[in-house]
Amino acid sequence: MKVAIVGASGAVGQEFLRVLEERKFPMDDLVLFGSERSAGRKYTFNGKEYEVKLLQHNDDFKDVDIAFTSAGAGISKEFAEDITKYGAVMIDNSSAFRMDENVPLVVPECNAEDALERPRGIIANPNCTTIMMVVVLQPLEQISHIRRIHIASYQSASGAGAAAMAELQQQYAEIIEGKPVTVKKFPHQLAYNVIPQIDVFQPNGYTKEEMKMFNETRKIMHSDVKCSAMCVRVSSLRAHSESVWIETERPISVEEAQKALAAAPGVTLRDDPANLVYPMPLETAGKDDIYVGRIRKDIADENGLTFWLSGDQIRKGAALNAVQIAEYLIKSGNVR
């Protein structure tokens, strides 16, 4: 089994290396690819040093079985044919192919079997906020069909990249030192602030990030569920959180929800508010599971349930989800 990582020097690329090593992914060889800026860098994996190769239009993927790509939508579109033409499975972390009808959009806890049918040889990894939410929604959907979802996301600085996280830390330092605040990676100062905008605004008034949650949730869950999101950038460093309201066909009790979520794969129940136990980014950063708590009946809707979740958007929201897809393909004998 030969594995490639495209975008190996980025935050998600580095997380791929950690996740693959931690999970003892069954592979015989590894090749790393990057831009001119990162080509030549060296990284250690399982005690062996690997040098990043320059990504080019050639036959470098001829012997690759699985390629994890995380270098942006433009690169994914440009190199998709080079990556897949000899039979490699491309598991793409960008937005390039998520809504392509010939590309499955997969969260293994929800729709792993969709990964087995991939006409273009590509499997898309959903947006991080979508992944985190549907992992929690799936066990509730099995109790009663979800008709409507309202989400407010609270997304950390690192969701905008490593440079954005560094800028937030710099902003705090500049404020303390009485210096002018540097604002380059965000629309406004993020330190001591929240920004109700992630990505660009669309004609309907929603942002691109918010529309991703609408479209991707429906595709993953094979559902016509109505879904409305408000995505907000907050001044935590790593791990996203979401406040979620759902309306189901029949009422789901708090006890039913807790029991289903406690048994669900990829979910950790942290729901004891009387003792100040609930999910927070400080505890979920670096963890694989999505943590859920504050589960309660919606007092405005007898068929409503509301809860709070938090998870590491770089792990389950990106690298881990992609690796789990690959593990499912191997287990299913669906890789050459």
State each model region's role:
Residues 1-190, 226, 259, 290-291, ...:
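N-terminal Rossmann-like NAD(P) cofactor-binding subdomain of oxidoreductases
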